[in-house]
């Protein structure tokens, strides 16, 4: 309700929380409960840094993957939080991008491998008497990784969002964000070997969301319905509302709009 946003992302094999100690249970909080607690207590990323300094982040089940977090406030400032060796590490996220493992600092370093990429078309050149020309627009991004691994998604997101043109309205920004995010949909099936059965909760893109923090509106679409829907947070009284959950989809069949052509 104050324009603070938070996101939790799987961070397997690289995070390490503090060990749970019964004597310190009053200042301990589960990694999966952290987002809800911070959104209820804080109004800015500075508030979050102060709040984290007063608690111990633990896991209720050490067998479950560790996670890391992205926080953003209405000023546009973003932070990444990772727990490494039991110690919280904050990173200023000026790119506004986060995926999964490896760590955020590694992902930034990896961008140096793609210093040759640029928006637009690559210039033509000559090989002796042979003249070479790009096949089409966007050839400046030839070589950008296209797979769905976290490092590749990080690279694509960094270059796509920084090259996106500025929009005039908030709604235009929302539509542009969804268009960019089209490039990150992970289809069901590629996460399991041939012949294996996907889990009940597949490691695929189940929903995509875009948050207009200025106007307090959350937009989303799902794997079953690509129509964009919204939740207006201004209509919710957060001082009195109780916990509430409902399915993202009423039906797993997307309605198809019929267009009539009059001749």
Model-derived features: where do they sit?
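A contiguous strand-loop segment
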Residues: 1-23, 63
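Secretory/export targeting leaders with adjacent low-complexity proregions
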Residues: 41-79
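C-terminal soluble interaction/assembly domains
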Residues: 191, 198-203, 210, 217-252
